[in-house]
Regions:
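Alpha/beta catalytic cores of nucleotide-metabolism and tRNA/nucleoside-modifying enzymes
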Residues: 1-28, 108-109, 170, 177-180, ...
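Short beta-strand/loop segments at the ligand-binding rim of alpha/beta enzyme cores
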Residues: 47-54, 100-105, 164, 220-230, ...
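Terminal amphipathic helices with adjacent charged low-complexity linkers/tails
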Residues: 80-95, 131, 135-151, 182, ...
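Active-site-adjacent beta->alpha loops and helix N-cap segments on the catalytic face
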Residues: 34, 84-92, 150-154, 174, ...
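Catalytic beta/alpha-barrel core
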Residues: 77-81, 107-108, 128-130, 168-170, ...
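Bateman/CBS regulatory modules and CBS-like beta-alpha motifs in cytosolic regions of diverse proteins
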Residues: 34-48, 55-57, 86-126, 131-133, ...
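Glycine-rich phosphate-binding active-site loops on the catalytic face of alpha/beta enzymes
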Residues: 71-86, 195, 249-261, 300-318, ...
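Catalytic cores of alpha/beta
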Residues: 64-67, 239-244, 286-304, 344, ...
Length: 501
């Protein structure tokens, strides 16, 4: 940013603007809102159908939220306040939730017990498991129907499974042909085998049903839902990244409160040099120089935002930050030159703020408080005075950084406090609270994307790049902000996409 205000050089940077300081100017439009394409890029190689990410926070994104986000066309970023094993398992759950073909299906040995088969089905939320020998040769299949009336859970799978020969398909079978086999034989699972009878994949009828139900889902090249995951810069960060990549994650986010740090650049470079095919995103930054440093480190995406979140206190505890519209604009100036997408992280209150972030230079936005109240978020549901709320907290809050019994916090190094000896010495940069319960994610996303489509229609942008090119801001006063909200009326019924904050 230029160190100049009203022609006076010195320590003062440019004027900082945030979402409430600006509006978008309407422009000529030749399309209807339903003709608009909201697809965009999270990173150089990860494309989503709606420009929304759920935040890597322990009250926002675990596997259930990530699955729901990808089905709506966005993507979830799994938080890292988990053990390495747990976070990798979360990635696996998302990847196995649906696919065109399961290339590495869960299997069970014929000598396993029915109790073990039950536990496996419960863990992965599946209704049946192929039975294979030690060489992965298909021996049969065991399903819920096979086990339903078996009271002795110590019996072996081989005693109740449906043995070969089964209806199977060859590797490379087309979708329509697979669907025809499932329909003709009235089965739910179609194992795919090679000429030697070795199991190579699995197609289920549920995947076809889900594909029809969620036509806008964001998927990888194998038809699996997209998912990202966060890592830090200290301790087990590199080991964690390797485990996540092995589990099938689509991108890694090196997630810290201060991305303009040598430690972040070093970790990005280390992950990039030791893995291929997985994009690495760095953050968070709020300046042009910070974004350029991450570009130089090899980032495939840049996350922008220092202190804009509703639960963040960095700007008052540390006195550091940049209002979010200006932060995105400045970071994008460095990122766009290198073809690196920008993620606007935090500070969004309404659907209109999404469009403002995109016009400022973001390619996608990351949402925390707007999604924390959803049914799929991992926050605790509570009732207060007859109303429903869900717990929400910053990853820099005491609750997120403290050790609870045997549960270790993996969040401290996000704020570079991993070396703090005791919880009493932590310096929090966030708070804990609750947000109103908002129902299923699908309803919330419908309103957010609907608002974005209206913004693109008003501005005159058929695609996100067109919105970015055509969008222009007008700065407003406090009176202009007051005029922008409903006024001179007592609101009796809240709209699903508006409440006075």
């Amino acid at each position: 940013m230029t160190a100049n205000v009203d022609g006076v050089p010195g320590k003062f940077a440019t004027l900082g603007l945030t979402y409430d300081d600006v509006l978008l100017l309407p422009g000529p439009s030749d399309m209807a809102p339903d003709e608009i394409d909201t697809a965009s890029y999270v990173s150089k190689n990860v494309r989503v159908n709606i420009p929304l990410l759920s935040a890597a926070m322990d009250k926002v994104t675990e596997s259930r939220m990530a699955i729901a986000m990808a089905r709506q066309g966005g993507v979830g970023v799994l938080h890292r306040n988990l053990s390495i094993e747990d976070q990798a398992n979360q990635v696996d759950l998302v990847k196995r939730s649906e696919s065109g073909m399961v290339t590495d299906p869960i299997t069970i040995h014929p000598d396993a017990t029915l109790g073990e088969a039950d536990a496996l089905c419960a863990k992965f939320r599946i209704s049946g498991v192929p039975v294979t020998d030690g060489n992965k040769k298909l021996l049969g299949i065991v399903t819920n129907r096979d086990m339903a009336f078996e009271t002795d859970r110590s019996r072996q799978v081989r005693e109740v499974m449906t043995p070969m020969p089964l209806v199977t398909g060859k590797v490379g079978i087309s979708g329509p042909d697979a669907m025809e086999l499932l329909r003709r034989h009235k089965i739910e699972k179609l194992p795919l085998v090679d000429d030697d009878g070795v199991l190579k994949g699995l197609i289920t009828v549920k995947d076809f049903v889900k594909a029809e139900k969620y036509p806008n889902a964001a998927k990888d090249g194998e038809g699996r839902l997209l998912v990202g995951a966060a890592v830090g810069v200290a301790g087990d960060a590199f080991e964690r990244a390797q485990a996540l990549i092995e589990a099938g994650v689509d991108f890694i986010v090196v997630d810290t409160a201060h991305g303009h740090s040598r430690l972040v650049g070093d970790m990005v470079a280390k992950i990039k040099s030791n893995s291929s095919g997985v994009d690495v995103i760095g953050g968070n930054v709020a300046t042009r120089d910070g974004a350029k440093a991450l570009v130089d480190a090899g980032c495939d995406g840049i996350k922008v935002g220092v202190g804009p979140g509703s639960i963040c206190t960095t700007r008052v505890v540390a006195g550091v930050g940049v209002p979010q519209v200006t932060a995105i604009y400045e970071a994008a100036l460095a990122a766009k030159e290198a073809g690196v997408p920008v993620i606007g992280d935090g500070g969004l209150q309404y659907s209109g703020d999404i469009a403002k972030a995109l016009v400022a230079g973001a390619d996608t936005v990351m949402l925390g408080s707007l999604l924390a109240g959803c049914e799929e978020s991992p926050g605790e549901l509570m009732f207060i005075n007859g109303k429903q709320f869900k717990s929400y907290r910053g990853m820099g809050s005491l609750g997120a950084m403290q050790t609870r019994g045997d549960r270790k916090s993996f969040s401290k190094d996000r704020y570079f406090q991993e070396g703090v000896a005791s919880d009493e010495q932590l310096v929090p940069e966030g708070i804990e609270g609750q947000v109103p319960y908002r129902g299923p994610l699908s309803s919330v996303v419908h309103q957010l994307v609907g608002g974005l489509r209206q913004s693109m229609f008003y501005v005159g942008g058929r695609t996100v790049p067109e919105l970015q090119a055509n969008g222009r801001f007008v700065r407003i006063t406090s009176a202009g902000l007051k005029e922008s909200h409903p006024h001179d009326i007592q609101m009796t019924v809240e709209a699903p996409n508006y409440s006075r904050q």
